[in-house]
UniProtKB/Swiss-Prot annotation:
This is Pantothenate synthetase. The active site is at 37 (proton donor). Catalyzes the condensation of pantoate with beta-alanine in an ATP-dependent reaction via a pantoyl-adenylate intermediate. Belongs to the pantothenate synthetase family. (R)-pantoate binds at residues 61, 155. It comes from Cellvibrio japonicus (strain Ueda107). One of its GO terms (molecular function) is ATP binding. ATP binds at residues 30-37, 149-152, 178, 186-189.
Length: 283
């Protein structure tokens, strides 16, 4: 695996791959890699000739009082995991390489309406930071395909919309959620869950699946379903951020005649904010 810290040298290496007719896959991450990240790399490997993984803890997507300074930096371990699955390139720039003029002077990319709801409502500016850095990374790597995890469903929907609106020539591929045996979605932030909390945090996945089952059985009282789910999370001792039943494409509140629905939820433990989602496709 070749490791690059600078845009120019990575571009030169990838230009040679393109001249050789190679199809380039890309997996953008913030590091602290776990099995779900590695599965995204494997998906890219199945679809492409060479794979680039990036590791950059993007300060632009962290708000005030969020955990940018606490976010685990585990580059040596991450590199070893990528080497083990034969990733071709690792791009790990520093902040100056990505934001040479500083973040205050950085041109921003904004996807209207979709970035201000759900996670965007409680994390103002977060998705603006995501779309900006992903646009920059797409321009640097110029991949044929980019793989994102379904766990971050809103992020996936926002990036799909951004790519469509800006005519960026990249195929967005979704990787399924990878879960622990009790249903907890794998996340870099799971390391902040305490030992006392750990047996109970799968409540988020359970209540979302409960809503899914009731929708599949014909219920369309979305407001009541979401309220009951929030009550279950409260009863388990966690603070609810949101439970929402949405149109899978637009992220607007689901209508009774929608056929593709995603149920999204977020809750707080003592040291982490956890998100999850499940989708329903109705006949």
């Amino acid at each position: 695996m070749q490791v690059f810290h600078h845009i120019r040298s990575l571009r030169e290496a990838l230009a040679a791959e393109r001249r050789a007719g190679k199809r380039i896959g890309f997996v953008p991450t913030m590091g602290n890699l776990h099995d779900a990240h590695i599965e995204l790399v494997r998906i890219a490997q199945r679809n492409c000739d060479v794979v680039v993984t990036s590791i950059f803890v993007n300060p632009l997507q962290f708000g005030l009082n969020e955990d940018w300074d606490k976010y685990p930096r585990t580059l040596a371990a991450d590199s070893a995991k990528l080497e083990a699955v034969h990733c071709d390139y690792l791009f790990c720039p520093d902040e100056t390489e990505i934001y040479p003029n500083g973040m205050a002077e950085q041109t921003r990319v904004i996807v209207p309406t979709m970035i201000d709801v759900l996670c965007g409502a409680s994390r103002p500016g977060h998705f603006e930071g995501v779309t900006t850095v992903v646009t920059k990374l797409f321009n640097i790597v110029q991949p044929d395909e980019a793989v994102f995890g379904v766990k971050d469903f809103q992020q996936l929907a926002v990036i799909r919309r951004m790519v469509q609106d800006l005519c960026i020539p990249v195929k967005i591929v979704a990787g399924d959620i990878v879960r622990e045996p009790d249903g907890l979605a794998m996340s870099s932030r799971n390391g902040f869950i305490t030992a006392d909390e750990r047996p109970h945090v799968a409540v988020l996945n359970r209540v979302l699946n409960g809503i899914k089952q009731q929708i599949e059985q014909g219920s369309r009282d979305f407001g009541t379903l979401a309220a009951e789910a929030r009550a279950h999370i409260d009863a388990a001792g966690f603070r609810v951020d949101y439970v929402s039943i949405c149109n899978s494409r637009t992220l607007e509140m689901a209508a009774h005649d929608d056929r593709e629905i995603t149920i999204l939820g977020a809750m707080y433990t003592s040291g982490a904010r956890l998100i999850d989602n499940v989708s329903v496709v109705l006949a």
